[in-house]
Amino acid sequence: MTGLSRERYAALYGPTTGDRIRLADTDLVIEITEDRSGGTGLAGDEAVFGGGKVLRESMGQSRATRADGAPDTVITGAVILDHWGIIKADIGIRDGRIVAIGKAGNPDIMDGVHPDLVVGPSTEIIAGNGRILTAGAIDCHVHLICPQIMEEALGGGITTIVAGGTGPAEGSKATTVTPGAWHLARMLEALDTWPLNVVLLGKGNTVSAEAMWEQLRGGAAGFKLHEDWGTTPAAIDACLTVADAAGVQVNIHTDTLNEMAFVEDTLAAIKGRSIHAYHTEGAGGGHAPDIITVASHPNVLPSSTNPTRPHTVNTLDEHLDMLMVCHHLNPSVPEDLAFAESRIRPSTIAAEDLLHDIGAISMIGSDAQAMGRIGEVVLRTWQTAHVMKRRRGALEGDGRADNNRARRYVAKYTICPAVAHGLDGEIGSVEVGKLADLVLWEPAFFGVRPHAVIKGGMIAWAAMGDANASIPTPQPVLPRPMFGAAPAAAAATSVHFVSPQAIEDGLADRIDVRRSLIAVADCRHVGKAQMPLNDAMPRIEVDPDTFTVRIDGDVWQEQPAAELPMAQRYFLF
């Protein structure tokens, strides 16, 4: 019997069970725990495409028609990195959804072929061999200031945005809000042709229940409470009361100046109800200096925005300039400068690193163009994981690989925001039945630039060479829009998430969109315990004078990183 070395097998079919993969140039290593597409027990029957290879007529390709159930697309031999595990498999896609994760091929001549992965003449092949597959990222904090952010989002592996805004209006530049039914309708129409799923947030800063209900009927899938509109205890209570009745999520940016409430007053107004706390550390806004303590509470779903991820020697200086612009402050006014400086605290930014690593802060978003970079959600997440491994070593249960840490961090921009916003029945993980919103990465470029972004089963964005070249690979290889980004295809492969009330009120008949409208699931029961791998609730204390942070009684010392991976090695600027 002829055998193959691991090196030879990986070169032919990609790595298999027991093989380890380094993520970009970080210190993070993942290990494949199961191979459903080949390896031991299935070796020799791997489904691979190409000249002289397996997936040919009457070999790996069967006679099965689409009517017989053949998938539209099979991704072969990809290493799936998701919150539920790290395995290798073939992935089948049909009608824009994942139909199977297992072994693809022709059951007439091959063993172990999954019944929903029978390759036929109608099946396209995407080679995932040697590549990593993740669920499309969900950016849970996006300001809709300019349409060009959609391109940056796709280029960073994002396939869903939780967003608000109307363009470069002052309200949108500062707050994640699309206010009122008219603006909601126009923005749903404007976003129809982009290959991204969209969740729009209405304005929750009001004590008028009807003002919120009309926004829900107009297409809002949740609300945003922002201090620049007045996040008073009365507005918090009124907004959550409507949200409870409607089944939608509320996202909050609390009162930095503590004019209307302190953190204790805000928590009292929330009354134990589910709420998504944006930029929980506080540099992006929120009760100074102790908003970070809300991450201790079982009903609060905490997230970070990416400029503070991870804490580096440049973080503080950059934030002061960002803050002055984003909140229309005047550096010559002492009160404005004091406002800015009260929000930028190295001790809480440093503590944010640790809270992510132990799973106490559950999500990471961008705060796009309003103190955040939409193209760096995935990148900043893995930089944080790298910094924490260097400082803290392996997590419990990790040893020769960092599977537990990798699963925790990938969850922060996939399944956790999906659960928080009632989207997890449709997106957020690589699981059967969900939309095929998937990202393929070359391991050397993992988290930096995707090899391909698959939106609803169609390649929407990819690394592509010169279009006038004789083959696809000549330089310059750049992230470029693909056919899945064409307007009609984007509408066919993407969805607008709206409130159930919008569906019931016939919103689809009132607006000019081609994509499907899907109601968010009731997420009012969701608390920290429902955040996969990110459900820790340590005791967090902040000294009001020194801003020293204690986590379960221990002071976390500031050690800002002076050097990061996934940086100058990949980017000129």
Curated annotation (Swiss-Prot):
Ni(2+) 2 binds at residues 224, 253, 279. GO terms for cellular component: cytoplasm. Pathway: Nitrogen metabolism; urea degradation; CO(2) and NH(3) from urea (urease route): step 1/1. Gene3D superfamilies: Metal-dependent hydrolases, Urease, subunit C, domain 1. InterPro entries: Amidohydro-rel, Metal-dep_hydrolase_composite, Metal_Hydrolase, Urease_alpha_N_dom, Urease_alpha_subunit, Urease_AS, Urease_asu, Urease_asu_c. Binds 2 nickel ions per subunit. Keywords: Cytoplasm, Hydrolase, Metal-binding, Nickel. The keyword Metal-binding applies. It is an enzyme of class 3 (hydrolase). It catalyses: urea + 2 H2O + H(+) = hydrogencarbonate + 2 NH4(+). HAMAP family: Urease_alpha. This is Urease subunit alpha. It comes from Mycobacterium sp. (strain KMS). The lineage of its organism: Bacteria, Bacillati, Actinomycetota, Actinomycetes, Mycobacteriales.
